[in-house]
Regions:
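Short, non-transmembrane alpha-helical segments in secretory-pathway proteins
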Residues: 62-100, 157-163
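Transmembrane-embedded, aromatic-rich helix segments that form part
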Residues: 407-411, 420-434, 547-549
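Extended, hydrophilic extramembrane loops/domains of integral membrane proteins
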Residues: 116-149
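Membrane-interface transmembrane helices that cradle and orient dolichyl/undecaprenyl
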Residues: 168-182, 351-354, 389-406
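Membrane-embedded, hydrophobic transmembrane alpha-helices
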Residues: 11-33, 144-246
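Exposed beta-strand-loop-beta-strand "reactive/processing" segments of non-cytosolic proteins
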Residues: 86-128
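Primarily membrane-embedded glycan-assembly and transfer machineries that use lipid-linked glycans
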Residues: 204-249, 256-393, 397, 430-548, ...
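Membrane-interface junctions at the ends of membrane-embedded or membrane-associated helices
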Residues: 1-3, 225-237, 396-407, 429-443, ...
Length: 593
């Protein structure tokens, strides 16, 4: 009993922290919403600046408007002299510029081709200083998220004094100073290397940021596939030694959770994704059509599955909604809940696989990884996707008929939140079938399929009560398939034909992982699910850093789970001899026997 006391304390500390923090969310958000500040209206889809910010057209004149120093003629002359504008106008003969007042003391000049339908250049000029504040061409006109506005996603989480310490905290407990060139270190660095791409994105260098996102994804895909080989029974698994005792790591989880929630309440912004969840929840509650006819400030917010909007209903009911894109406390509450849920599920999966040490290590990895905080501080729904997939993996750790039905139901929920997890449905369906006789395999597949179909039908009722399947298909699948985006190599360089081949390859990988014999434990399932999601993300035209949490917890499950002992379904840690020193009290806690 003495040997397991610290472990029990760690479990209780994490559980108590999650309960306490959930209670704080429910009590603190309404009162603190006023301190959050005006949320930045960040759009993740293309939108005309003229339409989004409603500048006021100004006729050409030599007389400045009342209260302004510059006239519209002077503003146009300043813009005409810019080398970037001269270059783009040479490409579009007959182009012309229109002048607008933008806000109190800013001017906007928009250049159009001779037809007046295509905006080819945009300049923002400060009236007081006469300085050019912004100048954009190409896709950065329509895609405001490509302009590198400070804090547009996650606000201060992008600051180096937050981001870099998180990177250190993420890798430090897993670093082995005796083996600095271990493969695990390379894996963790690959996960952190998305930061390089993000740094270029934050400075509006899209032609650098987009290609730099692919090497770590390709590496992680190859790494996950390499872990699918069946482990040899005669070879002991490699061990992982944490740099700090498990109890201190559990305290780190509590501290980082508090930091994340505090930062969300006082500093984060709600992007259009979180706003869409609140709008959709309100429409369901008021018995309005879920798809089509959305507000102009989030016109395409109805591009997600119905589950996404239904899960926001409790938060919309508790925190309310003003009908505007304001601080949206409901979106804050939902994002915090999704984050806590993912943390708790990782702990539960790790505890079931090997014991509390692995559970705490996985929970710590989630709360220390900067890109999960990036998602939380943007108040998006991406941690919900991760949580639903993790719940399905947890269900897969049980060998009962009810667990099989649970996998099917959770797979349907994940697929009808965002559609990419649909690639995991075959994997989750076939997990564990190799251990069953043929009659039991058929029954298990039938139960999984029935649970999947039944859940999908049930959660679709609010949408189908007003919208046809065709309308839903048009607003979701068709819109996402047809929208162009510069946030992938396919959209940035016009490689749509190659993109189709990658999409086909991703589908083939997902199907192959479901039927080809592979490692059959939870480590194998996590690695296969991570590989399938990464393969899908490699083939989508609109990729963004918020999607990293979809596969990150699965990658960590595979990487740490394989080091924590043979087999991924061990419930209890290995027994400790009475005469041996307590494993949990060692300065460097070993996860393997």
């Amino acid at each position: 009993m003495r040997a397991h006391a610290p472990a029990t304390a760690a479990v209780l500390a994490v559980a108590a922290a999650l309960v306490l923090l959930a209670a704080l969310v429910l009590t603190a958000l309404p009162a603190s919403a006023a301190t959050v500040g005006r949320s930045t209206s960040t759009l993740t889809s293309a939108t005309s600046t003229t339409n989004a910010e409603n500048p006021v057209p100004v006729a050409l004149s030599t007389v400045p408007p009342a209260g302004h120093r510059l006239s519209s003629d002077q503003v146009l002359a300043i813009a005409d002299r810019l080398a970037k504008m001269r270059a783009v106008r040479r490409e579009y003969r007959g182009s012309f510029g229109d002048v607008y007042l933008k806000g109190g003391f800013q001017w906007q000049v928009s250049y159009f081709d001779k037809s007046g339908k295509k905006e080819i250049g945009l300049v923002v000029i400060d009236d007081l200083s006469r300085r050019v504040a912004e100048q954009w061409t190409g896709f950065q006109i329509a895609w405001t998220m490509a302009r590198g506005y400070p804090g547009a996603f996650g606000r201060h989480v992008n600051s180096l004094y937050i981001w870099l310490p998180l990177c250190v905290l993420f890798i430090l407990p897993f670093f082995n100073f005796r083996r600095p060139f271990s493969l695990l270190h390379l894996d963790l660095l690959a996960l952190l290397s998305f930061s390089v791409s993000l740094a270029f994105f934050n400075h509006a260098h899209i032609y650098a940021s987009v290609p730099l996102a692919y090497p770590p994804m390709l590496y992680l895909l190859a790494r996950m596939l390499s872990l699918l080989r069946r482990a040899r029974s005669d070879r002991p698994p490699p061990s992982l030694r944490l740099l700090v005792p498990t109890f201190w790591l559990a305290l780190g989880v509590v501290f980082l959770l508090g930091f994340r929630i505090g930062l969300n309440v006082v500093d984060s912004n709600v992007i259009d994704v979180g706003y869409a969840g609140v709008i959709g929840a309100s429409r369901i509650v008021h018995d309005e059509p879920l798809y089509g006819g959305w507000p102009s400030d989030n016109e395409h917010g109805d591009t997600y599955g119905p589950v996404n909007y239904e899960i926001y209903i409790p938060f919309q009911q508790v925190f309310g909604w003003s009908g505007k894109w304001d601080d949206l406390p409901a979106a804050h509450g939902a994002a915090i809940f999704f984050d806590l849920l993912a943390t708790a599920l990782l702990f539960l999966i790790g505890r079931r696989m090997r014991g509390p040490t692995l559970g705490v290590a996985l929970a710590y990895a989630w709360v220390a990884y900067p890109f999960t905080l990036y998602s939380l501080e943007s108040n998006s729904n991406d941690s919900l996707v991760a949580a639903l997939v993790l719940a399905a993996v947890l269900a897969a750790s049980y060998r009962t008929q009810l667990a099989g039905a649970g996998r099917g139901a959770l797979a349907a929920l994940a697929a009808l939140t965002k559609f990419a997890p649909l690639a995991l449905a075959p994997l989750l369906a076939t997990h564990g079938l190799s251990e069953l006789s043929w009659p039991r395999r058929v029954r298990a597949l039938a139960l999984y399929a029935a649970a999947f179909a039944g859940t999908a039908a049930l959660v679709s009722i609010p949408a189908l009560s007003h919208d046809s399947l065709h309308e839903i298909y048009e607003q979701t699948i068709v819109y996402q398939s047809n929208r162009g985006s510069p946030f992938s190599v396919w959209g940035l360089y016009g490689l749509q034909d190659l993109e189709r081949l990658v999409e086909i390859a991703a589908a083939a990988i997902a199907l192959a992982l479901a039927i080809v014999p592979r490692r059959a434990d939870l480590v194998g399932l996590a690695a296969a699910c991570a590989a399938a999601i990464i393969a899908v993300q490699l083939g989508i035209e609109h990729w963004f850093y918020l999607y990293i949490p979809w596969f990150f917890p699965l990658v960590m499950l595979a990487l740490l789970g394989r080091l924590s002992g043979e087999g991924g379904t061990l419930i209890e840690p290995p027994p400790v001899a009475a005469s041996a020193p307590a494993r949990w009290s060692r300065p460097a806690a070993a996860l393997s026997s």
